[in-house]
Amino acid sequence: AGVDLYDAKASFVSNKVIKIVAGEDSEQITADTIVINTGAISNRLPIPGLKESKNVFDSTGIQKLETLPQRLGIIGGGNIGLEFASLYANLGSKVTVFETANRILPREEDIVAQLAKEYMEEDGVSFVLNAQINALENDEDDNVILSNHGQKMSFDAVLYATGRKP
């Protein structure tokens, strides 16, 4: 089955008809099956300093790092955060995951979350549960200083993996 891909704005005219607009051009397309992929961006929490601080990345930006951070802080203990925690720990980074819930993978069954945590701890990943990130800032060496419940910790880089939104 062939697939036609359009990079355009679209709106439904009816159940099987969409209107697509790309720049000045527009057309209507009829199909039995229409798949819409709206994309998604990282959900950025309103943490003071998150947007302004250097060496703070979303899941796309951290993949572009040219050097491995020795110390990586990860805000978010869901699927994305844990995937990167495992990857960077196995590459040699000292990884600390901060999760606001009382356990990682809060949407999964308890046993799954517990086993994942145990396996990752065996790989050297540290976890801070019930975290409350108050602020991020850079020191004079551009290290990221993360404040959790007022306690400050220093990282070479911080990943915020707090979900995706359309």
Residue ranges of model-derived segments:
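FAD-binding core/adjacent interface of flavoenzyme oxidoreductases
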Residues: 1-75, 132, 145-166
